[in-house]
Design a protein with these regions (language model features):
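A mobile, often basic/glycine-rich helix-loop segment
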Residues: 312-339
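Adenosyl-5′-phosphate
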Residues: 1-12, 138-144, 284, 301-303, ...
Length: 567
């Protein structure tokens, strides 16, 4: 019966919609003047829940620790989501009813004429995910991580923070004490997540990076049968799988290399978009879909190393720390620290006038993308810069992007998803660390590396690591060149009336300007591709008439010759 999704309502009148349209275990009831109804999609029987809880989901299938929940309490409806944001929870109000669901697609069925949320689209173009509490659909909202949304009556919800990431007043300075405490916390985090396992094998996504390697090592130490899965992008870029092979050999566990060839990526593109539910524009999502697909043939539980960068200030923090120090010493500089932070997403912020058609551009004029970052970067919760960046990373890139998409992709393949770094005791402990223990000179994640240096090969622990090298630009400019003419066709973009019709060709020629060069070309195209496929395959928009006047209709070499001739 696991994993499953749910959709339900709470209001002053009974709805027959669920019985007519949705198959699954069903439960209904009434409290005071309100009635409620929930269907558990994918369940043959109603899951066992705590008193007053009418719906809940655990990402890993650990049923004493739910990631989202729906409760009834004294004529109140309460929707809640844990601080890590591992499972999504959505709601909308239609007449005298509050609808809620764990998938956006389920709520699309109850909205008579759904419309794209332009603010959500703009946020997506800035971050590669839709910033909470917005979604990509008008009148549908997401419950923010660490928040409960409460209705005492139908019309006026209240929002209550149930958790804040806060810097500790006392800092751990002693390296040996920190190492000893961290080793215990890491082992305990994994032991809690394997306590319910019997003799079945589990999978671990092993990139060869530090975080996933630590998880694999701890699973082996806990006596669990482990199978590792890693991606093989072929001869493009710098391969990471040799590091995964080294770790697997060291731990004596089987390793499955998953073929992430352009052909397999293309075949999995639309299924990935549907599985994600919301638009996510990072290039890693389709390769992760392939990992889940292969793993699901051999296991029901998958472990990952997601969250390690957020907890221990991974490599992406270095330029931000430099920017923060510079800003403190030069407070009158035109571009502030939050703007610098916004630039680290490397998306379309700052390019709005060249990206959006005039009607959309006019609608977003009153928006400031920095507003979506202010709470996460609030210095009152974390006075020191490094902890403030960690708080922001947990709340933004973690809870709104990395964790919910990992769970969605696992659920689509019937997998429970477990992330040992999403452990509250471990996370709270990291806010006690002195800055020097996180970033020691130029060495990021220093204290984590010190804690595990005897658990893994030295070259794995101490090597410089970057994010997963998905060869998006190579794919887009070579293997998917003609496909871009379909996915981002000027005729379709023109009829959609969001983006300029020639945006894709502007990107590949470098004419969009600024920093959209090299790897950013592929990232920018992928962001648009994922939105367009979501718009047609999830939102259900009909495609406009295609144009044949675009460079992607020609072989790329011939188009480049044509360009030279034109100049």
């Amino acid at each position: 019966m696991f994993p499953y999704h749910f959709i339900g309502y709470w209001g002053d009148k009974r709805k027959e919609f669920l019985s007519q349209r949705r198959k699954g275990a069903k439960e209904e009831g009434a409290e005071g003047k309100f009635v409620w109804d929930v269907v558990y999609v994918g369940c043959e029987s109603v899951p066992v829940l705590a008193k007053n809880t009418i719906a809940a989901i655990s990402a890993g299938g650990v049923f004493d620790n739910f990631d989202v929940w729906v409760r009834l309490e004294s004529n109140k409806l309460i929707l809640g989501r844990d601080a890590f944001g591992r499972v999504s929870l959505f709601w909308t109000q239609q007449g005298g009813v509050v609808w809620f669901a764990s998938q956006l697609q389920l709520l699309l069925e109850v909205i008579e004429k759904p419309e794209v949320n332009i603010y959500g689209l703009y946020g997506y173009s800035c971050f590669s995910y839709v910033p909470n509490p917005l979604t990509s659909v008008n009148e549908v909202f997401s419950v923010c991580a660490g928040t409960e949304v409460i209705w005492k009556d139908i019309n006026y919800p209240q929002f209550r923070n149930i958790y804040q990431w806060c810097e500790s007043k006392e800092h751990i300075q002693d390296e040996n004490i920190a190492v000893s405490q961290l080793q215990v916390l890491l082992k305990n985090a994994v032991e809690k997540q394997v306590a319910d396992l019997q003799d079945e094998p589990v999978g671990v996504f092993l990139s060869g990076g530090l975080d996933s390697s630590i998880v694999a090592a701890l699973l082996v130490e806990a006596g669990v049968k482990v199978r590792a899965y890693t991606l093989d992008f072929g001869n493009v870029g710098i391969p990471e799988y040799p590091y995964a092979e080294q770790v697997a050999e060291f731990l004596n566990i089987p390793l499955v290399k998953v073929d992430a060839s352009p052909k397999n990526i293309k075949n999995a593109l639309v299924p990935t978009v549907k599985a994600l539910d919301l638009p996510f524009g990072d290039g890693v999502t389709v390769p992760l879909y392939l990992l889940n697909q292969v793993a699901s043939q051999e296991t029901q539980i998958i472990f990952n190393g997601e969250g390690g960068d957020q907890l221990f200030a991974g490599w992406t923090n270095k330029p931000l720390i430099a920017a923060g120090i510079y800003q403190a010493e030069h407070p009158n500089q035109e571009e502030g620290f939050i703007q610098q932070y916004l630039r680290t997403f490397h998306r379309f912020w700052g390019y709005e006038k060249r990206v959006y058609q005039p009607e959309i551009y006019a609608q977003i004029q009153g928006l400031n993308a920095q507003d979506w970052l202010l709470n996460a970067l609030d210095a009152s919760f974390c006075p020191s810069l490094l902890h403030r960046l960690r708080r922001a990373s947990l709340m933004l890139k973690g809870a709104q992007n990395i964790h919910p998409r990992a769970t969605a992709l696992g659920f689509a393949h019937g997998l429970g998803v477990r992330s040992p770094f999403c452990d509250l005791l471990l996370a709270e402990w990291t806010f006690q660390l002195s800055g020097e223990l996180c970033l020691h000179g130029a060495c990021e994640k220093y204290i984590l590396k010190r804690a595990v240096e005897n658990w893994l090969p030295s070259e794995i622990v101490w090597r410089q690591k970057r994010g997963m090298g998905v060869p998006l630009t190579s794919w887009c400019l070579n293997d998917f060149w003609h496909d871009i003419g379909n996915w981002l066709n000027p005729g379709i973009l023109s009829s959609d009336n969001y983006f300029f019709p020639d945006l894709a060709s502007q990107i590949v020629t470098g004419e969009l300007g600024g920093t959209i060069q090299g790897r950013r070309i592929g990232e920018s195209l992928w962001l648009l591709i994922m939105w367009q496929l979501w718009y047609s395959h999830v939102f259900g928009s009909k495609l406009g008439k295609k144009s044949f006047y675009h460079p992607f209709i020609l072989p790329r070499w011939l188009w480049k010759k044509y360009q030279q001739f034109q100049t």
